């Protein structure tokens, strides 16, 4: 039975122009406020560390919160996207407080612009990043709906590999978005995002 339950949420977008350190600090401040409300206990200042499962580097890889109250578990994931109507990039974070600790927990979030050129047709990312079955699923839709559908499928792929803690390790087309693993819950975030954006949250438990 999946343990992918418990409160979760999204941060507001923080402009990347704020600088990487300030943007991350602002996102962690929002996560701190959300966790305090979710747990009903004060949460102090939070920090962030990384661990790459492939090379062991602490300069990149899966993000993990530091400074959590004793006995509490929470996960975070981050994404960057160019906001609609502007050339400015922004960072968006997701947090999850699992209902019970367990091995193998993972969280992944991805947000993309529905009108991004990469998803416009099958000559771009749409032709190489998706499986035959995924491309067939998109072709079932009216032509005007296909770019957004490709973008949404891509966010599912990104969220899945982030929740697995690996990132893409091979051909993105091999990451199946039509058959979701039993230990993963996928949440379509589109209705929670500004117009023109699509997104997916992946919560992985055991």
Which residues does each PLM region occupy?
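Core catalytic alpha/beta fold that binds nucleotide/phospho-ligands
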Residues: 1-206
């Amino acid at each position: 039975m999946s343990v992918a339950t418990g409160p979760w949420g999204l941060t507001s977008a923080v402009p990347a122009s704020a600088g990487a350190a300030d943007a991350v600090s602002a996102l962690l401040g929002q996560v701190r406020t959300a966790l305090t409300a979710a747990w009903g206990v004060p949460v102090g200042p939070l920090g962030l560390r990384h661990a790459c499962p492939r090379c062991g580097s602490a300069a990149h890889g899966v993000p993990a919160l530091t400074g959590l109250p004793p006995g509490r578990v929470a996960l975070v994931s981050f994404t960057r996207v160019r906001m609609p109507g502007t050339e400015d990039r922004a960072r968006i974070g997701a947090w999850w407080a699992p209902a019970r600790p367990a091995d193998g927990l993972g969280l992944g979030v991805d947000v993309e612009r529905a009108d991004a050129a990469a998803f416009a047709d099958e000559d771009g990312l749409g032709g190489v990043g998706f499986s035959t079955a995924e491309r067939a699923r998109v072709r079932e839709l009216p032509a005007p709906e296909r770019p957004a559908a490709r973008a949404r499928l891509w966010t599912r792929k990104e969220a899945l590999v982030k929740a697995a803690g690996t990132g893409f390790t091979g051909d993105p087309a091999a990451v199946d978005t039509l058959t979701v693993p039993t230990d993963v819950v996928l949440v379509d975030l589109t209705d929670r995002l500004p117009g023109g954006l699509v997104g997916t949250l992946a919560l992985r438990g055991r």
